[in-house]
Amino acid sequence: IAGFIVLRLRGILGKRTGFEGKTPAQFENILKKVHQEKKTKQNENFDAVAQKEFLKGAKIAYETIITDFSDNDNKLIASKPLLSKKIFDEFNKALVERGQRGHFAEITFIGISSADIKEHKKLDKVLNVTVNFVSEIITCIRDKEKKIISGSPDKIKTIYDTWTFSRDISSNNPNWLLVDTLN
């Protein structure tokens, strides 16, 4: 009986031979449009779920950029993909100046106390999101002789930063760039 059922199903459904043909072009175009519309709607909606996901990434970016800026190799290797050209140039200039003075940073990132979206604006196809960060950092700047110029190697300092991230929502690139900083 089972063999009979299998043969009947095979006769009705057929078997795959590899020569079935492709989906008709008219359906491919419809599928592409549906996927594109869904993608566009997801990019344009910056709802509570999107904001929560954004803040997760923003916290990681914040810590990465702060610790990379404190690295004394003056390369900003980890941060470069997260920074707009303007911000990268500003940070790089500050690092070069610090190096020319013979100063080096000792920064220990303790953690982020809070990160809240202050505002988000869509301008054409670009979404800008401004975030208020409150973090705890131990920071100390030393000179060539290792004398402390500023900060303390033992004191945790509360830092208040306001950073603006930007992303072209029409792009397939999911990365956000840091485009502005205020302290």
List each model region and its residues.
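Juxtamembrane and targeting peptides
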Residues: 1-64, 141-145
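A composition-biased, non-transmembrane "mature-region" signal
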Residues: 5, 14, 45-65, 69, ...
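Core segments of small alpha/beta cavity-forming domains
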Residues: 35-112, 116-118
